[in-house]
UniProtKB/Swiss-Prot annotation:
Keyword flag Transcription: no
Gene: sucD
Subunit structure, interactors included: Heterotetramer of two alpha and two beta subunits.
Protein function: Succinyl-CoA synthetase functions in the citric acid cycle (TCA), coupling the hydrolysis of succinyl-CoA to the synthesis of either ATP or GTP and thus represents the only step of substrate-level phosphorylation in the TCA. The alpha subunit of the enzyme binds the substrates coenzyme A and phosphate, while succinate binding and nucleotide specificity is provided by the beta subunit.
Protein name: Succinate--CoA ligase [ADP-forming] subunit alpha
Amino acids binding substrate: Y159
Coiled-coil residue windows: none
GO MF annotations in UniProt: nucleotide binding; succinate-CoA ligase (ADP-forming) activity; succinate-CoA ligase (GDP-forming) activity
Secretion signal span: none
C-alpha cells in the first residue's frame, strides 16, 4: 500500500515539450513511472521520449486512460493548466511550477472546490511511492520501499530526511511535497490523514517551515487523531520577521508563523522535533524505539 500514487498510476505530463519537462520525463520513465501521454497545445501528434503528445488534457485522457497529471508549465499559464486537468476529471494534479501569482492560485483553489481532482503543490517537488512511481523532480535513487511516510513543505529537506532514513536502513511508503507557496492544494492534514489510514505506513516525518499556521493546525490534528508516531522539523529557526526565506509562504508576518511557536505547538501535541536537519533520522529512530516499532521499520538490507 501507499498513498495517492502507486505502480498502476497512469501519468500525463503537461508542458512535456519544454526543456525542464523533457529532462524530468526521462528521469521519471527511468524510475519506472507509467508516463502514457504529454500535453502541449499545438504540438499534438509529436512523440517525445517515446511518449505521445496531445493538444489537450481531455484528448490525452480519452486516448490513454491517464488519471494523474504533472504540471511543468511556465508560471503565467500554470493555473490554466491545473483548471484544464480538473475539467477533465483527473484524480490528481501535481504542480511543480514555482512563481505562480497568489491571485491565480486563489482562483484555482476556488475552482477545485466540490470537484474530485486533488491538487498537490504548486511549487513542490512532487510525490513518490518508493520503488513504484515517481512524479516530480526528486532524486529517485534515495527512496527505498518501507514503512515511513514523509510530508514536507520543502523539497530539499525532504531529500535530506529520506536520504538519512535510507542510510539508517529505514524505507519509506510515500513522500509527498505539499509545496512552499501560501496557497496550495493539499495540506499537512490531508496527507497525515492518508498516512494514518494506510496500513503500510507505521510512522511519519513531517517537515514544516516558518510562515502561516499549517503546522500548528496539523499538530492539533495529530494530537486528536493520529495513532502512529510523528516526528517533525521546522525550517527557518533563525529567520528575521518580515523577510521571505526562499519560499513565497516562508515569511513571519504580524508576529505569527515563527519557528519557535511551531516547535512549541508540535512538542505540546506529542510530536518530537529535530533541532537541525541532520537530526531528523535519529529523531525518528528515537520515537520508533519508544513506540516499539523500530525493528519493523528496518526494511533495507545493508
Amino acid at each position: 500500500m501507499s498513498v495517492f500514487i502507486d505502480k498502476n498510476t497512469k501519468v500525463m505530463v503537461q508542458g512535456i515539450t519544454g526543456s525542464t519537462a523533457l529532462f524530468h520525463t526521462k528521469q521519471m520513465l527511468d524510475y519506472g513511472t507509467q508516463i502514457v501521454a504529454g500535453v502541449t497545445p499545438g504540438k499534438g501528434g509529436q512523440v517525445v521520449e517515446g511518449v505521445p503528445v496531445y493538444n489537450t488534457v481531455e484528448e490525452a485522457k480519452n486516448e490513454t486512460g491517464a488519471n494523474v497529471s504533472v504540471v511543468y508549465v511556465p508560471a503565467p499559464f500554470a493555473a490554466d493548466s491545473i483548471i484544464e486537468a480538473a475539467d477533465a476529471d483527473l484524480d490528481m494534479v501535481i504542480c511543480i511550477t514555482e512563481h505562480i501569482p497568489v491571485v491565480d492560485m486563489v482562483k484555482v483553489k476556488r475552482y477545485l472546490q466540490g470537484r474530485k481532482t486533488r491538487l498537490v503543490g504548486p511549487n513542490c517537488p512532487g510525490v513518490i511511492t518508493a520503488d513504484e512511481c515517481k512524479i516530480g523532480i526528486m532524486p529517485g535513487y534515495i527512496h527505498k520501499k518501507g514503512h515511513v511516510g514523509v510530508v514536507s513543505r520543502s523539497g530539499t529537506l525532504t531529500y535530506e530526511a529520506v536520504h538519512q532514513l535510507t542510510e539508517e536502513g529505514i524505507g519509506q511508503t510515500t513522500a509527498v511535497g505539499i509545496g512552499g507557496d501560501p496557497v496550495n492544494g493539499t495540506n499537512f492534514i490531508d496527507v497525515l490523514k492518508a498516512f494514518n489510514e494506510d496500513s503500510e505506513t507505521k510512522a511519519v516525518v513531517m517537515i514544516g517551515e516558518i510562515g502561516g499556521t499549517a503546522e500548528e493546525e496539523a499538530a492539533q490534528w495529530i494530537k486528536e487523531n493520529m495513532n502512529k508516531p510523528v516526528v517533525g522539523f521546522i525550517g527557518g529557526q533563525t529567520a528575521p520577521p518580515g523577510k521571505r526565506m526562499g519560499h513565497a509562504g516562508a515569511i513571519i508576518s504580524g508576529g505569527k508563523g515563527t519557528a519557535s511557536e511551531k516547535i512549541k505547538t508540535l512538542n505540546d501535541c506529542g510530536v518530537e522535533t529535530a533541532d537541525t536537519p541532520s537530526e531528523i533520522g535519529t529523531t525518528l529512530i528515537d520515537a520508533a524505539k519508544k513506540a516499539g516499532i523500530y525493528e519493523e521499520l528496518l526494511t533495507i538490507k545493508k
